[in-house]
Amino acid sequence: MAAVVVDANILIAARLSRDQNHERGTAITEAIDQGQLPTAYVLSDVLEAVINYLQARGGHDIAVETLDALIESSGFSLKQTPKSDFDAGRSVFRQYESLSLTDAVIVAAMQREDIEYLYSFDDGFDSVSGITRLTTPDNPFER
């Protein structure tokens, strides 16, 4: 089955109306949630980062609403990050100055799962070969 990975900044932008990428983030998350885009994996590290950020910036209610919406969505699939991805991510982190540790773990998971497409507004991923970053609600498998 075709799958993509979604970065924290997409989910955060969709939930915070003041975010500069709010409209694009909302369009992407709604298309995923409605099944117009492939299943989107959300790694547990990413989920924690999103919920913690939203709680700090938007309040507890928006954090809880987001958590529940992601869990209940048929378009998003929450994935526990295995230790092997964290270990591989540490190696990726050492190689790419443009990536945070969480971003590097995303890369490691994508490499392990052989997933090419990532919805993200972070251009730091552009330096990683084998990953195609998407910033609009387009289905990469229907090109």
Regions found by a protein language model. Give the residues of each.
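Metal-dependent nucleic-acid phosphoesterase active-site entry motif
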Residues: M1-Q20
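Acidic, PIN/NYN-like endoribonuclease modules and their adjacent C-terminal/linker elements
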Residues: A3, D114-R143
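PIN/NYN-family metal-dependent endoribonuclease catalytic core
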Residues: A3-V6, I28-R57, Q80
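A general alpha-helix detector
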Residues: I10-L11, A49-V50, A88
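Amphipathic alpha-helical interaction elements
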Residues: A13-S17, Q55, G59, R94, ...
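Short active-site oxyanion
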Residues: Q36-A40, G75-S77, D114-E116
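Helix-adjacent hinge/juxtasegments
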Residues: N52-K79
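Active-site neighborhoods of divalent-metal-dependent phosphate/nucleic-acid chemistry enzymes
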Residues: L78-E116
